[in-house]
């Protein structure tokens, strides 16, 4: 399986994402600069965290206009796995690929520490190697990770089982404790916690590696079945 790690001005987690895929999983991965216009030849797309374009106007608001973004939307429409982490999640919201918006954390402080997540949906291509209800430890690093949506959208997320992860406690004020959501097709995931920073027990947790393994496992099963 071949992954693309999108690199934007201000990305700062692209190297961690690359390491998780290449060094921990042993899969193919390439950096793709934001000025590129095609993602043909890639099987999965990873949008890392950071502060794209300095978070000016609004987190992800300028990044949505990057040359590569139409190709990201095309990959999502084709059913390829697309993962956006932290700022990547915000960008996916700005692109309209995921619902909701991000507000400042409730205490207006930047949070940077390991947190407990609860797996709410173990049936997606990103979470199938977890158990529903499983408690995992993944670090967060954000100042604007307070997920917000209106009541109608929240009800739809619950009905469609689109809530992938919730926080084990109220760390930032997110509606219903939401930490990550998938689109209706289940091939686009946005999450504020950083799974790429939890791929080695030396760092305190390897729970994030399971997410990447899930992606690869599902891709291989699908492609072997259709070969």
Swiss-Prot record:
SMART domains: GATase_5. It is found in: Cytoplasm. Residues 3-225 form the Glutamine amidotransferase type-1 domain. PROSITE patterns: GATASE_TYPE_1. GO terms for biological process: 'de novo' IMP biosynthetic process. GO terms for cellular component: cytoplasm. Its main location: cytoplasm. Pfam families: GATase_5. Its EC number is 6.3.5.3, 3.5.1.2. It comes from the Bacteria. It catalyses: N(2)-formyl-N(1)-(5-phospho-beta-D-ribosyl)glycinamide + L-glutamine + ATP + H2O = 2-formamido-N(1)-(5-O-phospho-beta-D-ribosyl)acetamidine + L-glutamate + ADP + phosphate + H(+); L-glutamine + H2O = L-glutamate + NH4(+). The active site is at residues 86, 194, 196. Pathway: Purine metabolism; IMP biosynthesis via de novo pathway; 5-amino-1-(5-phospho-D-ribosyl)imidazole from N(2)-formyl-N(1)-(5-phospho-D-ribosyl)glycinamide: step 1/2. InterPro entries: Class_I_gatase-like (IPR029062), PRibForGlyAmidine_synth_PurQ (IPR010075). Keywords: ATP-binding, Cytoplasm, Glutamine amidotransferase, Hydrolase, Ligase, Nucleotide-binding, Purine biosynthesis. Part of the FGAM synthase complex composed of 1 PurL, 1 PurQ and 2 PurS subunits. This is Phosphoribosylformylglycinamidine synthase subunit PurQ. The gene is purQ.
